Amino acid sequence: MRNFLYCTGVLLLLWMSTSSQAALNIEIFGGGTNKIPIAIAPFNGERGLPQSISAIVSADLERTGLFKLVDTLGLTSQEPEQIRYIDWQGRGASALVVGSISPLPDGRIDVRFRLLDVVKQTQLTGFSGAVTTEQLRAFAHRIADIVYETLTGEPGAFSTRIAFVRKQGSQYALQVSDYDGFNARSLIEYTEPIISPAWSPDGSRIAYTSFEKKKPVVYVQTLATRERKAVANFKGSNSAPAWSPDGSKLAVVLTLHGGSQIYLINADGSGLQRISQSPGIDTEPSFSPDGRWLMFTSDRGGSPQIYRMPVSGGVAERMTFEGDYNVSPHYSPDGKRFVYIHRNAGRFNVAIQDLSTRQMQLLTDSNFDESPSFSPNNRMILYTTEIGGRGILSTVSSDGQAKSRLSQEAGNIREAVWGPLLKQR
């Protein structure tokens, strides 16, 4: 199954070694029609800063596939009363973002922005704040969130975080970063594999599987304190944790009674309860947002396919029928769809299926994708794809129209998962 090894209920990837420091470069490609034409004018005063706020906002919005960026060459940010709306109308913009950056006496930076309706020539919203240089990127994501929500009526997901595993040389590191891969920091590092990270619903903890004890054990780690606890260390293999929507329970995969089966435990590791009963391998559980269903991968029918069963157990319903290899299901936050990996003509691609129509759509056309998960606003999907023998972070819009690649100069990135929406302070 091309580099995948079905082992103790886990799809364990055999990683290749890499070394040296990593740098990030964003590449966005693809796109469709019926997008909102928006111009993001260069912010006054941002030249010379280590990061361009207008460039970050532009990349955020373009990555969703819902916006068409209008050329701003030769035009700059101005105060609303000075703006020549006819110039922006001539370039096809229906919305315009302008802003300014200026230094403050205490060393911080004052950032201001406005979102304008080019057609009606009115201001839709505005925002300002004083930040440090290190906070510029987060503030730019906040601006993009405000623009996105104002124009679409949906919350933006640009201020969220992701988790992933990075292998460099013989070292495995569980890392957390901004949603676009920047500002990564390591939670733990070991010379043994770390796999299947899963965010708690409130974003305060991450469950994951570590092989540091020479066998797979499930841990839960608190991000703020870095304290962790082994919550599934039963006889045999313990793997593939998934949080219930209320954060009180975890679904895990154990070989406690022989084959790999799905169990429920409380978030502290107590209250073990067996859920699946099959002669095959059941693995990779995912809770439905309402907490009623578990979707999972099983080879009970002879090939890896995706099934769904009540969280209390019972009869499993097969969900995928196209092809002989469908794995790694992940529910959308609204519960209407699920995303997974589908083998297509020897390629492993991200696919999405509508639960009401059962229609499947391929979203990617690369060779080897894995670990898809939705953004918390349903609009984007995070996954890793293999290029040149190493995994890199990528996103695709949920309609498949816009793809974004975060290229790492070094390091092998796998097991990516998107975190929940965070409350704005």
UniProtKB/Swiss-Prot annotation:
Entries under Pfam families matching the protein: PD40, TolB_N
Domain of life: Bacteria
Keywords annotated in UniProt: Cell cycle, Cell division, Periplasm, Signal
Main localisation: periplasm
Keyword Cell division attributed: yes
InterPro entries attached to this UniProt entry: 6-blade_b-propeller_TolB-like, PD40, Tol-Pal_TolB, TolB_N
A GO cellular-component term linked to this record: periplasmic space
Residues of the signal peptide: 1-22
GO biological-process terms attached to the record: cell division; protein import
Gene3D superfamilies: TolB, C-terminal domain (2.120.10.30), TolB, N-terminal domain (3.40.50.10070)
Compartments where located: Periplasm
Quaternary structure annotation from Swiss-Prot or TrEMBL: The Tol-Pal system is composed of five core proteins: the inner membrane proteins TolA, TolQ and TolR, the periplasmic protein TolB and the outer membrane protein Pal. They form a network linking the inner and outer membranes and the peptidoglycan layer.
Task of the protein: Part of the Tol-Pal system, which plays a role in outer membrane invagination during cell division and is important for maintaining outer membrane integrity.
Family as reported in the entry's similarity comment: Belongs to the TolB family.
Listed name of the protein: Tol-Pal system protein TolB
Native source species: Nitrosomonas europaea (strain ATCC 19718 / CIP 103999 / KCTC 2705 / NBRC 14298)
Lineage, opening ranks: Bacteria, Pseudomonadati, Pseudomonadota, Betaproteobacteria, Nitrosomonadales
